């Protein structure tokens, strides 16, 4: 059954909602276009009513674009394309408002947008901008008055400028322009030109224009506020980081400026910048004036600073941020150096003005280099230069910034940011009175940087070498419980007998560094402290691995030495029975101190640190390296993922840190001789006790005596290489000697000093003799007294004596060779003297193969 035309019309009149929905779907421009038989696009003018029907859809699309896109140009471009269709305008353009050198202007961002335009074709690159001052053109008038302007005929408009038409070969007839405001501030101007279906834009067009521009206004406001927020954030970061660096260097303006400018380079948003430092001398020295007074040279006639100083740049620091970062320091630069040749820095130093140059190549006042500056092909495009002024309002330097990274000219926000930086740096010049207070902090900074450079914490992959939870359980150690980790470690650790960690003759020569890490973990299990003090097993593994990485890869004082000291401490406690005097907590601290005692050792001794004026020597007055090792160990323990003390209570934690302080500082051999007599007194005192149990009970309660014994144990551990079997000790001795010789080389080349014989590789043949002297003077006492103290330690003393015999034999052999050489030289000298005497007494003269005496 079909409906008549009248019935259909009546139904639609009675059901307006259905009619609206039906025709909205069926009569969209796209469907109408598809229905065209000839395939031609529909006439936009005839579809004006349909466009209005589709207005809600268009607005929805714009809102979606605003949500999905963070690109301002892309969103505004879509708005302008839609406006071209709705207004029947030939094209639309976007002009962004900005300020340079205190002068406001409008620059094209999107130009000649048409309904079928592509964003890339309409987006104006920075070097092709059309710029209007506010006193030129209709767009400038709109920005000044902050009101919409509808120009029906540009020929009758006094504000119209044909400048853009001449550049683009276009004829503007009429236009509609409106400002985009953020409060009272102009953000941009949007303009539509040349009505296609009428002589000019109507009031209805103005309403549509404003309606759709609400979306553009909203997005441009967001963009503008985001830009201002970004600028303020950058400014805050610049001031924060420059303040950080300024207060690290308070004695030298050059280093102060360099550190600050280099640190904030990422926030300056430019490709290159240079800092010219001005000579602050107001009066010349007498010997410089004489040549002028004598008429031998002309007086200075160049520009001067506002306070009357001659403008002389004594140094230029050039920061290259494009391509490979580079810093070039040019002392006493010539006037034709590229950074000065334009005359801009001198002008800024003379006038104190901020100069913002949009197009350097076209500037008439300053002559910038037109071609590429270097092999990289870098060109000067735009420049921002400003003075650095101190609190006395003296210009101390000029900072010049080149080429904003996004290609646009520097704007008002860039000027504010750079001025904040230069102003702060200028004021900071007067802060040198705080140098003494900051000196120690400066040294700490240098040391912290050095620590970071050489220390890398155990990462997620490295821990799998010891705790392979991924392979075993398919998850990370952090996701495993302690029982699971314990089972894995039980299988992965070598056990106490594999490498003889209970033995005094232990040798690391057959072990890898990873084996030593595993042995270190095993020692904590053997001490029974893992379960007792609830050490997280993942933390224990990370700690040992990080300790091993904290040791530098040097000849002797490396991770192997650090582990050997800890293993000897473990052996003295367990095999040597010294554990009977100490609690589990104290043994825990002592083994840890052994592991940390030489961490980050540099291969040079304390005396070298002082001679070379190393920051460590300035930071620590005595036991320089030992205090640094202690601080490094504490630094690692302060990290939660490495803190094996994390489950100790406050009193326990204070106690272990106190013991570590004593144990590590005690490895300074300069202190060894101070404690020898006290240790010997304790050993003698132990012999007065017939009952060993009573002695153990007595000493266990004597805190001071226990600390003295512990300090001497650290010395015995540190020197324990001398007590190893000869085949091990002879190799280790060569490693020690090699490291000493390396220090001797440094003293000879860097310090220009003659090293002592022990560190002079030219006297390497004297090593056996030096070893015998070292054993007699330093080592014999400590191991002899420990063997008296506990007979279980006697093997160390016996091997020491055996090694002395070996070194003595080598020393005697060397002495015999030296003596034989000396005797031979003496015989030759006597023989030569005898021949000379015979000649003098009339004896036969020696025959010569080169001359004949007649």
Curated annotation (Swiss-Prot):
Question: Domain of life here?
Answer: Eukaryota
Q: What reaction does this catalyse? A: 3',5'-cyclic GMP + H2O = GMP + H(+)
Which SUPFAM superfamilies does this UniProt record tie to the protein? GAF domain-like, HD-domain/PDEase-like
Top-level EC class, please? hydrolase
Q: What region holds the PDEase domain?
A: 481-814
Q: Which GO terms describe its biological process?
A: cAMP-mediated signaling; entrainment of circadian clock by photoperiod; phototransduction, visible light; retina development in camera-type eye; retinal cell apoptotic process; visual perception
Instruction: Provide the binding site for a divalent metal cation 1.
Output: 561, 597-598, 718
Result, substituting residue 219 to H: In RP40; autosomal recessive
Q: Which GO terms describe its cellular component?
A: photoreceptor disc membrane; photoreceptor outer segment membrane; plasma membrane
Q: What EC identifiers does the entry list? A: 3.1.4.35
Q: Where is the active site?
A: 557 (proton donor)
Q: Which cofactor does it need?
A: a divalent metal cation
Which keywords fit this entry according to its UniProt record? Answer: Acetylation, Cell projection, cGMP, Congenital stationary night blindness, Disease variant, Hydrolase, Lipoprotein, Magnesium, Manganese, Membrane, Metal-binding, Prenylation, Repeat, Retinitis pigmentosa, Sensory transduction, Vision, Zinc
Binding of a divalent metal cation 2 occurs at 598
Disease note = Retinitis pigmentosa 40: A retinal dystrophy belonging to the group of pigmentary retinopathies. Retinitis pigmentosa is characterized by retinal pigment deposits visible on fundus examination and primary loss of rod photoreceptor cells followed by secondary loss of cone photoreceptors. Patients typically have night vision blindness and loss of midperipheral visual field. As their condition progresses, they lose their far peripheral visual field and eventually central vision as well.
Subunit: Oligomer composed of two catalytic chains (alpha and beta), an inhibitory chain (gamma) and the delta chain.
Q: What is this protein called?
A: Rod cGMP-specific 3',5'-cyclic phosphodiesterase subunit beta
Which gene produces this protein? PDE6B
């Amino acid at each position: 059954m079909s409906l008549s035309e009248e019935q259909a019309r009546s139904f639609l009149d009675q059901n307006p909602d259905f009619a609206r929905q039906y025709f909205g779907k069926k009569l969209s421009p796209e469907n109408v276009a598809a229905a065209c038989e000839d395939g031609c696009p529909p006439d936009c003018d005839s579809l004006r009513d349909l466009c209005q029907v589709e207005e809600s859809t268009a607005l929805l699309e714009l809102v979606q674009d605003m949500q999905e896109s963070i690109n301002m140009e892309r969103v505004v471009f879509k708005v302008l394309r839609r406006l071209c269709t709705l207004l029947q305008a030939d094209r639309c353009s976007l002009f962004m408002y900005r300020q340079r050198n205190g002068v406001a202007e409008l620059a094209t961002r999107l130009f000649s947008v048409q309904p079928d335009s592509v964003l890339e074709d309409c987006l104006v690159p920075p070097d092709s901008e059309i710029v209007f001052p506010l006193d030129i053109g209709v767009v400038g008038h709109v920005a000044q008055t902050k009101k919409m302007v509808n120009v029906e005929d540009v020929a009758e408009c006094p504000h119209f400028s044909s400048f853009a038409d001449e550049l683009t070969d276009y004829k503007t007839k009429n236009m509609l322009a409106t400002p985009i405001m953020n409060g009272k501030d102009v953000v941009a101007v949007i303009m539509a030109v040349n009505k296609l279906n009428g002589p000019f834009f109507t009031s209805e067009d103005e309403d549509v224009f404003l309606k759709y521009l609400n979306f553009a206004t909203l997005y441009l406001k967001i963009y503008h506020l985001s830009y201002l927020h970004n600028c303020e954030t950058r400014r805050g970061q610049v001031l924060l980081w420059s303040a950080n660096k300024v207060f690290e260097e308070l004695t030298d303006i050059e280093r102060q400026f360099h550190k600050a400018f280099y640190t904030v380079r990422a926030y300056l948003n430019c490709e290159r910048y240079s800092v010219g430092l001005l000579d602050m001398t107001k009066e010349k020295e007498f010997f410089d004036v004489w040549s002028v007074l004598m008429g031998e040279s002309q007086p200075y006639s160049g520009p001067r600073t506002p306070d009357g100083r001659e403008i002389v740049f004594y140094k230029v620091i050039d920061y290259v941020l494009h391509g490979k970062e580079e810093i070039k320091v040019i002392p006493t630069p010539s006037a034709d150096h590229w950074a000065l040749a334009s005359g801009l820095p001198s002008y800024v130093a003379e006038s104190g003005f901020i100069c913002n140059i949009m197009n350097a190549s076209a500037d008439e006042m300053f002559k910038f280099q037109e071609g590429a500056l270097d092999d990289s092909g870098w060109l000067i495009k735009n420049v921002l230069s400003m003075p650095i002024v101190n609190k006395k309002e003296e210009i101390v330097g000029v900072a010049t910034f080149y080429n904003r990274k996004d290609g646009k000219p520097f704007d008002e926000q860039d000027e504010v940011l750079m001025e904040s930086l230069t102003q702060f740096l200028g004021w900071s010049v007067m802060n040198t009175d705080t140098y003494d207070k900051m000196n120690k902090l400066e040294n700490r900074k240098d040391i912290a940087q050095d620590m970071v450079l050489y220390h890398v914490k155990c990462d997620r992959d490295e821990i799998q070498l010891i705790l392979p939870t991924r392979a075993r359980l398919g998850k990370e150690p952090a996701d495993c419980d302690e029982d699971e980790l314990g089972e894995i470690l039980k299988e992965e650790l070598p056990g106490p007998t594999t490498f003889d960690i209970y033995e005094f003759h232990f040798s690391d020569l057959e072990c890898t560094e990873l084996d030593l890490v595993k042995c270190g973990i095993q020692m904590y299990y053997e001490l029974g402290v893992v379960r007792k003090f609830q050490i997280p097993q993942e933390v224990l593994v990370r700690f040992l691995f990080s300790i091993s990485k904290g040791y530098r890869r040097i000849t002797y004082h490396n991770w192997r030495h650090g582990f050997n000291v800890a293993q000897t401490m473990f052996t003295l406690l367990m095999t040597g029975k010294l554990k009977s005097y100490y609690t589990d907590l104290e043994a825990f601290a002592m083994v840890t101190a052994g592991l940390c005692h030489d961490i980050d050792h540099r291969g040079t001794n304390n005396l070298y640190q002082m001679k070379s004026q190393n920051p460590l020597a300035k930071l620590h007055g005595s036991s320089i390296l030992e205090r640094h090792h202690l601080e490094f160990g504490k630094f690692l323990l302060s990290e939660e993922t490495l803190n094996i003390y994390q489950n100790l209570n406050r009193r326990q934690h204070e106690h272990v840190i106190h013991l570590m302080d004593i144990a590590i500082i005690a490895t300074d051999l300069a202190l060894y001789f101070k404690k020898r007599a006290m240790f010997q007194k304790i050993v003698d005192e132990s012999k007065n006790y017939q009952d060993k149990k009573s002695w153990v009970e007595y000493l266990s309660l004597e805190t001071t005596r226990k600390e003295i014994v512990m300090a001497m144990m650290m010395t015995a551990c540190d020197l324990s290489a001398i007590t190893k079997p000869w085949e091990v000790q002879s190799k280790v001795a060569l490693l020690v000697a090699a490291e000493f010789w390396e220090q001797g080389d440094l003293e000879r080349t860097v310090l220009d000093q003659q090293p002592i014989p022990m560190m002079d590789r030219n006297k390497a043949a004297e090593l056996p003799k030096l070893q015998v002297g070292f054993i007699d003077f330093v080592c014999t006492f400590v191991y002899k007294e420990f063997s008296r103290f506990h007979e279980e330690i006697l093997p160390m003393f016996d091997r020491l004596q055996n090694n002395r015999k070996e070194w003595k034999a080598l020393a005697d052999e060397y002495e015999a060779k030296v003596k034989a050489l000396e005797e031979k030289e003496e015989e030759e000298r006597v023989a030569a003297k005898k021949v000379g005497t015979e000649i003098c007494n009339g004896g036969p003269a020696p025959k010569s193969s080169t001359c004949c005496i007649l």
